[in-house]
Amino acid sequence: MIKKLNIIFLTFFFYLFFVNFSQANFQEKLINKYKTINTLSFDFTQKIGEKVEFGNCYIKYPLLMKCEYPKKKKSIIANGKRFVIVKKKYKKIYHYSLKKTPLIYLLKKEIILNLIENSEPLNVDSNIIKYELIGNNSNKIKIFFDKNTLELLGWKTIDVYSNEVSFLFRNIETNILIKNEIFKIPKEEDL
């Protein structure tokens, strides 16, 4: 009886030890990989409620992002201070403070690194690692990484209208040359 208890205890101990060691090793690899990323280029699928849109996007850390939605003749630009939606079809530009959007957390690499370093993943399955970030306004942002390549795969959040918004990446390229000019906000008269 005592031998059985010892075997069960040892098995349980080794399981806990190796799971924690494996998790720490994984987090270290993810942190090291993410530290080396300065730019991202990718195609995306964005889903807001039942509405699905496609496009391509460029991110340059910190705080720069431009995404094009070709079918909608629309783009979004974050230039470090402002977040704008450019609707070329209507020749309109809508301005917002970047600080008031969830993108502020996603475009600061240090915030994501801090999240990985100081948090346990929300979920780990065979392909995806999911972390959850809670912003200052209690907005929850789920951030997805590929378990095998450790690439950032996208995020999911709730918008101001209580719609679930998912933004998923594919065809990801890292550390490509991206000129700062693409993040320049146009003037409405130039549309």
Where are these regions (language model features)?
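Classical Sec-dependent N-terminal signal peptides that target proteins to the secretory pathway
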Residues: 4-23
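Cleaved targeting-peptide boundary
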Residues: 22-32
